[in-house]
Amino acid sequence: MQGQTQSISFDGREIRLTTGRYAPQAGGSVMIECGDTSVLVTATRSSGREGIDFLPLICDYEERLYAAGRIPGSFMRREGRPPERATLISRLIDRPMRPLFPSWLRDDLQIVATCMSLDERVPADVLSVTGASMATLLAGIPFYGPMAAVRVGLLGDDFVLNPSYREIERGDLDLVVAGTPEGIVMVEAGANQLPEQDVIEAIDFGYEAVCELIKAQESILKDAGIEQVKPEQPEEDSTLPVYLEKACTKAIGEVLSQFDQSKADRDSKLDAIRSSTAETIEALKDSDPVRKLVSANSKALPTSFKALTKKLMRQQIVKDGKRVDGRSLDQVRPISAAAGVLPKRVHGSGLFQRGLTQVLSTATLGTPSDAQEMDDLNPSTEKTYLHHYNFPPYSVGETKPMRSPGRREIGHGALAERAILPVLPAKDTFPYVVRVVSEVLSSNGSTSMGSVCGSTLALMDAGVPLKAPVSGAAMGLIKEGDEVRILTDIQGIEDFLGDMDFKVAGTDKGITALQMDMKITGLAMGTIAEAINQARPARLHILEKMMEAIDTPRDGLSPHAPRLLSFRIDPELIGTVIGPGGRTIKGITERTNTKIDIEDSGIVTIASHDGAAADEAQKIIEGLTRKVNEGEVFSGAITRIIPIGAFVEILPGKEGMIHISQLSEARVEKVEDVVKVGDEVTVRVREIDNRGRINLTLRGVPQNGEEAEPAPAPTPVAPLN
């Protein structure tokens, strides 16, 4: 079980690929490691299924908490449903792998990446992507690889290859680049309003490292004596495609060139052409080869008809520079935007429409206790900004069961979330937890970028002080031989029949998020740079239209949003505020009808719909945490009486005791002879004992309205600026 290990060094970090040692019954397996992070990746192929017209590829990323030396917190103490992070990494593996399998392959393929050990300095996601390529090559699956991925960070003015978690948090860029020898196949990034040129340079920097990892995979194959299985296109029967080209080209071309029609009309006309063609084929003789082929395979006609439609649409774009809706290549669809479309019980709302794509986004403000706790391998323990994306079937005019969010919904929500994160206010100035939900009401391309635009409108309507508004656009690509055409603001059919979906989001200063997926085996750096630069005027045009609806965040919050009051206390006094078993803080919340959150750093956040109640809770906490000195004089009410003395609330929530001997200069037989519960008295702090108990006295202190020595002003509480 020795296996073979190939190592490659990046900026002092070594990546190791071990093959031939683990999972011997999998089609191919590799343990890919960097630092103490180890990911086992397997690729397995089983016989194909009859009658399908797609590649049944499944990519799964599995997290095991033992990788970080932890036991799951669930009742069963076992990992359950994959967390959102695992779903996103599964998509990260799938997106660069899928276009590298031949279009004719119909075998069941499964790639499983299992994180076996996690080093907090080394994220496991990009290792999983590279491992997926290596495992697929070892499995002998037809594949246009090798493919590899790296992460690029930006610290100051320097690019960092495969940065640690801390470097990612500190930096202005988190970019993942995947590529093949032919070019780049996938890009995903979050950025802190970086200029386009900086992002382009980062992608180029990352691709150089990708090429080194590709060479390492080729070396492993060579040393093991394994020859890569290159995809070979099987002979296809051209009978049906040739027939359709003669019978349908003119009719399809006429439909695609009718620019003033709606999507529904165009789809209806194309369906009518296909149905008419099916009837014509059905009327052919039984011995006719076209009828035989269509009768034997129900998918043959729809597949060939779609291929012809794709070919004609692409030709129209390349040769005539016209799209199916008549737009030029760099033209954005008509845009409308509105803020505050829902009643203010919804804290903020925005409606964004671009062409036939319509998204309604809502923003909800919550308290720190509403933060999402993360039970996964990510060092971050909670999320205070959440974006959830919903894609109901009616948005595309279909009927389907309504189920929980799938991978696509989770991925689109994460992209929109990432686009907004860099412009959110600092926690110190705006301590709210914010949840945005984007409801896709109508879909015809680029709903994720529509969600970004809708989010901006909703957040500004909710009064969230964004650093800058964010808009987004989706770019497309048609590549026919050496002819390349980049499309701005692609709609559904252009996404479906095109070669690229490149989403770019950002402010007027720069990019905050981007995501590129390909349907071809690689794209040159120059074309990617052109797409990024072409997206900027589109983004700014969209942003201008959004600003016509709302150009600055609202001055006030919704009357139904909670009011938060934040201040700092000495972290060593947190226990005093909480009290034994939480008794003190529970009493404060019940007395004032507020929610109170205290962080380990000493930041206290009080949430209430009543400002006066929040102020009262703050006074109580300040009283509890204020240092009391011997000799200070306070006025307060008698709260309770015991045989040996009486208790006085000298500050909100803080009591001291007057011993019976300190009630009067004369001897007192019974406490009630001098004071009763509710009496207002003026007391002096006689001493504070070694257990922190405050002992008070009435002796020598003026009473009954006589002027008393004022207490010193309380220590100022540091505001949260």
From Swiss-Prot:
GO terms (BP aspect): mRNA catabolic process; RNA processing
Regions of compositional bias (Pro residues) in chain numbering: 711-721
Disordered, as annotated region: 700-721
Cofactor: Mg(2+)
Keyword presence, Lipid biosynthesis: no
Transmembrane segments: none
Domain of life the protein comes from: Bacteria
A Pfam family it matches: PNPase
Main location: cytoplasm
Molecular-function GO terms, alphabetical: 3'-5'-RNA exonuclease activity; magnesium ion binding; polyribonucleotide nucleotidyltransferase activity; RNA binding
CDD domains recorded: KH-I_PNPase, RNase_PH_PNPase_1, RNase_PH_PNPase_2
Catalytic activity: RNA(n+1) + phosphate = RNA(n) + a ribonucleoside 5'-diphosphate
EC number assigned by the record: 2.7.7.8
Keywords of this entry: Cytoplasm, Magnesium, Metal-binding, Nucleotidyltransferase, RNA-binding, Transferase
Domain S1 motif: 631-699
Keyword set includes Zinc: no
Domain KH: 562-621
Compartments, record wording: Cytoplasm
Binding site for Mg(2+): 495, 501
Xref: NCBIfam families: polynuc_phos, PRK11824.1
Chain's role: Involved in mRNA degradation. Catalyzes the phosphorolysis of single-stranded polyribonucleotides processively in the 3'- to 5'-direction.
HAMAP family assigned: PNPase
Family of the protein in this entry: Belongs to the polyribonucleotide nucleotidyltransferase family.
Protein's name according to its UniProt entry: Polyribonucleotide nucleotidyltransferase
